[in-house]
Amino acid sequence: MRIKQSEFIISAVKPHQYPIDHRNEVAFVGRSNVGKSSLINSLTNRKKLAKVSGTPGKTRLINFFLINNDFYLVDLPGYGYAKVSKSEKDTWGKTIETYLSHREELKRIVCLVDSRHKPTGDDIMMYEWAKHFGYDVVVVATKSDKLKNAEFKKSEKLIRETLNLTKDDKLYFYSSLNKKGTEELIDKLFLEFATDID
């Protein structure tokens, strides 16, 4: 499929602010600075659709983007940034938890991890939480352009072991810089929710 149209719809904190048109939703979640906004912009081929912040942890809202007038891509606040207060972290955590635990329209969670590093405790907790509640979960390892060819297998092994992924669990490597495999990744993440698959 091709993403022909992508549109920012609303930023939300509370459930009453979420869209009410019952379209399917695919949520992106990951720690601050994992490259979530860059990935969204790359997949949609829109340089400024999701704001890329130079300050980790600045995105505090749930952002809903309508894709091909068909389904929502949902950008969740980044977690794990050390330089914010505990109360702010708690607030972000509750915002994410409220959305993930009560959203019938949510069909898939895309967990982002940094391909260069071992997944953090927060990454593990988020992945296990998503699996526990029965969501279809896809792991995308970002910034793969930073890896040498010989490092891919080592990185994949480390991520799979740390997150306790099975052979059937989905893990994809992606670079927003070189965009290799963009079409394949779009299909893997969104195709089953699309009505226009051209």
Curated annotation (Swiss-Prot):
UniProt cofactor(s): Mg(2+)
Entries under InterPro entries matching the protein: G_ENGB_dom (IPR030393), GTP-bd (IPR006073), GTP-bd_ribosome_bio_YsxC (IPR019987), P-loop_NTPase (IPR027417)
UniProt-annotated binding residues for Mg(2+): S37, T59
GO molecular function: GTP binding; metal ion binding
A biological process from GO: division septum assembly
PROSITE patterns for the chain: G_ENGB (PS51706)
Ligand binding (GTP): 30-37, 57-61, 75-78, 142-145, 174-176
EngB-type G domain segment(s): 22-195
Pfam assignment, any one: MMR_HSR1
UniProt KW keywords: Cell cycle, Cell division, GTP-binding, Magnesium, Metal-binding, Nucleotide-binding, Septation
A cellular component annotation (GO) from this entry: cytosol
Function per UniProt: Necessary for normal cell division and for the maintenance of normal septation.
NCBIfam families: GTPase_YsxC (TIGR03598)
PANTHER family: ENGB-TYPE G DOMAIN-CONTAINING PROTEIN (PTHR11649:SF13), MSS1/TRME-RELATED GTP-BINDING PROTEIN (PTHR11649)
HAMAP family according to UniProt: GTPase_EngB
Family: Belongs to the TRAFAC class TrmE-Era-EngA-EngB-Septin-like GTPase superfamily. EngB GTPase family.
Protein's name in the database: Probable GTP-binding protein EngB
Species in which this protein is naturally found: Clostridium botulinum (strain Eklund 17B / Type B)
